[in-house]
């Protein structure tokens, strides 16, 4: 101990990671980090034989003599299904009938022959996921067909060598010419807030409360006519506030640029409050109707652990969304630049669980929990943000089967496109806790396809140095990362876990935030 009293009063600087993990390859697989990030071409259509159109309800081939006699009115193509027959020979360990594009992806995926033979169905699932372009988002996402007579996932694979049908749906979309989504080794972490603007449509309640009717109600929802641009603008005018945001807010300073718009900080003239304002050019939004859903959802989500929606304005074709501003930046800055202790990790987990308990109680699944989407105040406050992927669930649709979110944080039931519920957020929270320990999520340095395969088949990921963690922390992680969804803890249950009782005051995060900002400044 020093004899200098002044030095004793000054706390030691928080530990800093020797190098940022954001752009590192981790040394695990240097080749995997160099995989191509170019948009993938569409699945090539086979010339022989011609692709068959499968009847949505009966599953039978169209074009029979009966159809020729009936001569029904021909309407424009809708919900087109390109059926691909893929088989797997368990003896040779080879797939048969696989599209050339899928075969090329598999060849460069680093999924070994042994892994392919061990679980060929998982291989097909991740190939279909990776190559799908049915939903255009900043990060890879997928909506599987949910038609009567079809399972929600890829059809079961016959491992004896006979063919199976992998249904690839080509939806009638507004942005059908857009390039397929791409998975990056890790997306550039959020410098500030709000990099996406669209969410999945909120399921409308249906009359039949029987859960078994979910497929039919989902089918009805998909048949709902799309809103025209004029209808969307009219609806927005009924939601937003009247006025010019450039008169109500001053000192605009650009802090970020996302695919959906530009983000500024500004000051409320009347209150003197600093806010974040996202300016969105609606003409550049392919799915404008989803913005309405996002605003309506955000208006309802008022909670101390959620970055709160404040106001919105419409000026011409420009939509201004005003949100609470947190100057501490994202948790990603802290986990990649500093080392957190267990008590600090417990504090962050507690705050996030409080937000999730609130969301889940209101039938909302966030679906994209990760450090990028956790924002920090300079005083240490912790808040969830970015509801670009959130979804509301109703008693009639208590499970969802869309594949949405950022792959490395996805729960296995999402990757394999099984029906899922709010506990997908708990799995992602567990992965985020590993981020706080190791600086990155598991499999980040793997080829994306292999990462998806490992998530689908490996179950709970292994820690790099589990012996360094306390038994109580390991138990908390196990409760979050339980493969059996029924055994996985809920937000309400985990808030009672003994690990959270170790949490330090939120003010203990401030030195980490400052250290991260300093480290990032030095790295520039």
From Swiss-Prot:
Q: Which residues bind ATP?
A: 255-263, 278
Q: Where does this protein have compositionally biased stretches of type Acidic residues?
A: 169-178
Residues of the region (Autoregulatory region) are 69-137
User: What region holds the CRIB domain?
Assistant: 74-87
Q: Where is this site: Cleavage?
A: 212-213
Question: Recorded E.C. number(s)?
Answer: 2.7.11.1
> What cellular component terms from Gene Ontology apply here?
cell-cell junction; cytosol; focal adhesion; glutamatergic synapse; membrane; nuclear speck; perinuclear region of cytoplasm; postsynaptic density
User: Region (GTPase-binding): which ranges?
Assistant: 69-112
Q: Which residues carry this modification: Phosphothreonine?
A: 60, 134, 143, 154, 159, 169, 402
Q: Which GO terms describe its molecular function?
A: ATP binding; identical protein binding; protein kinase activity; protein kinase binding; protein serine kinase activity; protein serine/threonine kinase activity; protein tyrosine kinase activator activity; small GTPase binding
**Residues that bear Phosphoserine:** 2, 20, 55, 58, 64, 141, 152, 197
Bias (Basic and acidic residues) occurs at 67-81
- Protein family membership: Belongs to the protein kinase superfamily. STE Ser/Thr protein kinase family. STE20 subfamily.
Q: What is this protein called?
A: Serine/threonine-protein kinase PAK 2
Q: Upper taxonomic classification of the species?
A: Eukaryota, Metazoa, Chordata, Craniata, Vertebrata
